[in-house]
Amino acid sequence: MDFSQFILPEFPEYYIYPTGQIYSIRNKKYLKPRFDKDGYERFSIKNVLTNKIQTIKTHQLVAMKYLNHNNTNGLVVDHIDNNKLNNAVHNLQLLSPLQNTLKYCYSKVQKNGLPSCITYKIKKKIYVFKLKTPECVYNYECKNLLDCIEKKNEIFKKIVKGKLN
């Protein structure tokens, strides 16, 4: 088998497998990931382009190798099944920051069963409010940001009174 297919040019000392495993060619062993404060796997590996040790998340490495992701294209790497530990290429996709935020909003549910964000559309821009209080996700046409904030407050009052429809 030709293992060169698993190498990224900037990290030639490592095999990056489609499963998300990272293998050190020099040390002849799989690297053990560490975890960042948000629960993502990460590795500290040498980047030959900068000649420095770089800490990088596993899903970003896999996306760089198999999805042609670079940090300059404005896209973010998303876990399709929302499992931060499933870094297999078939579970990763590239999304715009807005798409990623909206996916998060509509997929995450608070302990009370309600969504965790609210979105507002003002002209052609969409504003997303992450909620720490119980509010539902709605899409509103707003005249301006102040109008959106007022509508957000109206929704909150209705929820508190138990009259949301």
Regions found by a protein language model. Name each.
Residues 1-76, 83-164:
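Conserved recognition-core residues within compact binding domains
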